[in-house]
Amino acid sequence: GAANVAANLANLDVHVYIGGVAGKDTHGDLLQDLLDSDGIDNSGVVISRDRSTITKMRILGDRQQMMRLDFETVRDVEQQEEEELISWLDSLCQKGLDGIVISDYGKGVCKDSILEKIFNLANCYKIPTIVDPKGSQWEKYNGATYITPNVKELSERVGYSITNDDDKIVTAAKEVLATNNIQYIIATRSEKGISVIARDGRIWHNPATQQEVFDVSGAGDTVVSMMMTCLASGLSMRLALHIANGA
């Protein structure tokens, strides 16, 4: 989840703040301890008394993930929880942030009203945002700087199956950019690497380096973390893309 992105950023020596909702339970306490151990500021984690902390159990065999069991409560956050999150983020924006990462897993935190307020704050303070999307309704991401779908997620958004070819990816991305207020689509393409399509028409392709992979869990989080770190540091898109792809 978002905590994995936060941990990746912290391991890159980035000062990280994390916001979200956890339950008042043992797993929630463990989450807070893990965040503390990575030096991540968790003051934005709202503790809910009527929601359990999302927990995932991975079943591995021969170094590969065979299946995953999720234990979770899926529903929109309460109004009070939303207000706490936005107040926390507003305070940070006033102090100064270099970037905002939004990890949407469709669990109820990234609802339309919260995202609208996040993008309004980010644009007001000129802070770049990068979104890891969920689902086919991307109108809620209008105002984002970057969005990082994989081929399957991009296919879901345009409503038809896309083959993993440069021209097909570019065509689909341009279709999305024409109907959504998003500046860049960063398409992660497995063995084909990463492609970036900008609203102004610029296109970058960076092929992947072939290597044996036993578990791709978290690969998208790695791309999000590296891209945000590089771009927030002022590196060019081409260099950021090269570094993120190599990670």
Can you annotate each of these PLM segments?
Residues 45-51, 58-95:
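Conserved phosphate-binding/catalytic loop of the ribokinase/pfkB sugar-kinase fold
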Residues 107-203:
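Conserved phosphate/ATP/ADP-binding segment of small-molecule kinases
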Residues 1-55:
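Substrate-binding N-lobe of the ribokinase-like
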Residues 180-183, 209-247:
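Conserved post-catalytic alpha-helical subdomain immediately downstream of the catalytic base
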Residues 101-102, 118, 129-131, 137-140, ...:
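Extended, hydrophobic alpha-helical segments in both membrane/secreted and soluble proteins
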Residues 17-21, 44, 99-101, 130, ...:
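A structural signal for isolated positions on well-ordered beta-strands in alpha/beta enzyme cores
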Residues 92-109:
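Short acidic, glycine-rich surface-loop motifs adjacent to enzyme active sites
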